[in-house]
């Protein structure tokens, strides 16, 4: 959702709490608003390869809660489904467990709470006028979950199609979870770490 992030970078906002698998890097993704010091807290599962985030973390300018990726997606899903919390063995007995309620079932587990959002900013390949969405490839990982976990979902799409152009069995997010749609532009597909045979 690069165009949405560009718009956020131009707005007079601060103290944002973001929920994202990563913060981005190389001038793309949420790093655009990170370097403007607009993010107060971030929930994410990967922070590697981002020197700007590293600097702010070490300077205690941003609070980061690292969440194991499976737990991360389940916390988002729990918010969308109205689940008040769940126990998982992932992270039990580690730094992740600090300050969390623990219980033993078949093995030690920790209580994880849902991750709710005021806004979800997601990108889909296609949307129809009713807000039904279709995602391309890995964009389908977290986007449907975030659409359900947020009070307001803003969707940037590459292609606006007519109602019925997305077959019902191919709808990844139903329009009931979508409040705003716009067609974006100027998309690039950068490669974060290029590896070729022989290296």
Language-model features: locations:
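Conserved alpha/beta enzyme-core scaffold
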Residues: 1-199
């Amino acid at each position: 959702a690069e165009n949405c992030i560009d718009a956020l970078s131009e707005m007079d906002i601060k103290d944002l709490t973001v929920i994202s698998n990563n913060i981005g890097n190389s001038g793309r993704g949420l790093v655009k608003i990170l370097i403007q010091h607009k993010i107060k807290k971030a929930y994410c599962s990967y922070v590697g390869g981002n020197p700007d985030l590293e600097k702010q973390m070490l300077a205690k300018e941003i609070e980061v809660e690292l969440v194991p990726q499976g737990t991360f997606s389940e916390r988002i899903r729990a918010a969308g489904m109205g689940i008040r919390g769940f126990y998982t063995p992932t992270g039990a007995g580690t730094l992740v467990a600090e300050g969390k309620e623990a219980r033993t079932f078949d093995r030690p587990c920790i209580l994880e709470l849902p991750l709710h959002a005021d806004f979800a900013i997601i990108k889909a390949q296609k949307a129809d006028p009713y807000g039904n969405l279709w995602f391309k490839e890995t964009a389908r990982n977290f986007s449907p979950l975030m659409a359900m976990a947020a009070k307001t979902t803003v969707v940037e799409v590459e292609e606006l199609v007519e109602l019925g152009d997305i077959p019902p069995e191919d709808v990844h997010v139903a329009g009931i979870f979508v409040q705003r749609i716009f067609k974006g532009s100027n998309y690039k597909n950068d490669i974060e770490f290029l590896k070729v045979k022989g290296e």
